[in-house]
Amino acid sequence: MEELRERVWHGSLNVEIMLSDSIVVPNTPLSEKCYHIVVLRESFLALYLPAIVRKLGNNVIVTYENPYKQWWFEYDGVPVPWEYPCGVLFDFLCNSSTTSTGKEDDQRLQMWKLKLCHGNKYPPGILPLVDGLRQVKDHWKHQWKQACFILNGSAKRIMSLSIPDFEAFWQSLISRHQPDYIKVREKLLTPNKTKHIPIRVWTADASFLQPSIPANSDTMTLFDVMTSMDIKLQENNRAIIQGIVICSDEDIINLYDLFASIDGFLYVVIK
């Protein structure tokens, strides 16, 4: 179990960032308008913006204030929100996955091709990044407040964390130090007293659902959760968690324990 958690924590994606045609300097060589980077599934795209803009920023025709404000990503012409973990976005937008038996396809080799865009007007669905890293941190804390409320019936646990504990929690994401992350995360959970499971479901038709799933009932499987939302899992309609196709008879509490993301939610992508 610990090995699986560690694999989830260190899971990564190969990403190609290409400057949007609308902002790139004409006749820029491909090598200077394209950047290949490895991002962690359990991270946020916004955290990579400074490095990306530093690499590509000299080849744009726009004037920009900083590496966060008025920048966004697109995939196949669709704006990509920064506020969800990278792995969740990849699972929803791309087709690659790993079976629950461990047999892998080309996920590790597949390149996630994103366009880097800039403009005064954000496209619909994009949360403006006006306060840089602080905004990412505040958003992440707000997500954990929601998750704690669902788990415990109150956000008191995260709100009562000491400043050093909360800073250690945040820095564990930046420094990728899993033991520090787990140490603080355990303070936010109440084993055997969980009220509901923080779960978010992205359906094949792009609907985003957040069902109320009680944790104190008899064993509830992924199939039960999907059935409660009138979602049928079939060969051509699979549930993907952390890049893995999950069997429908898996216990939902165990899935949360193993695969909950860095913002406290278990994300299920239906494809």
Curated annotation (Swiss-Prot):
GO MF terms held by the record: Atg8-family ligase activity
Record localization: Preautophagosomal structure membrane
Keyword entries, A-Z: Autophagy, Isopeptide bond, Membrane, Protein transport, Transport, Ubl conjugation
Domain of life: Eukaryota
Protein name listed in UniProt: Autophagy protein 5
Biological role: Involved in cytoplasm to vacuole transport (Cvt) and autophagic vesicle formation. Autophagy is essential for maintenance of amino acid levels and protein synthesis under nitrogen starvation. Required for selective autophagic degradation of the nucleus (nucleophagy). Also required for mitophagy, which eliminates defective or superfluous mitochondria in order to fulfill cellular energy requirements and prevent excess ROS production.
Originating organism: Kluyveromyces lactis (strain ATCC 8585 / CBS 2359 / DSM 70799 / NBRC 1267 / NRRL Y-1140 / WM37) (Yeast)
Gene3D superfamilies assigned to the protein according to its UniProt record, in alphabetical order: 3.10.20.620, Autophagy protein Apg5, helix rich domain, Phosphatidylinositol 3-kinase Catalytic Subunit, Chain A, domain 1
Gene Ontology CC: Atg12-Atg5-Atg16 complex; autophagosome; mitochondria-associated endoplasmic reticulum membrane contact site; phagophore; phagophore assembly site membrane
InterPro entries: Atg5, ATG5_HBR, Atg5_HR, ATG5_UblA, Atg5_UblA_dom_sf, ATG5_UblB
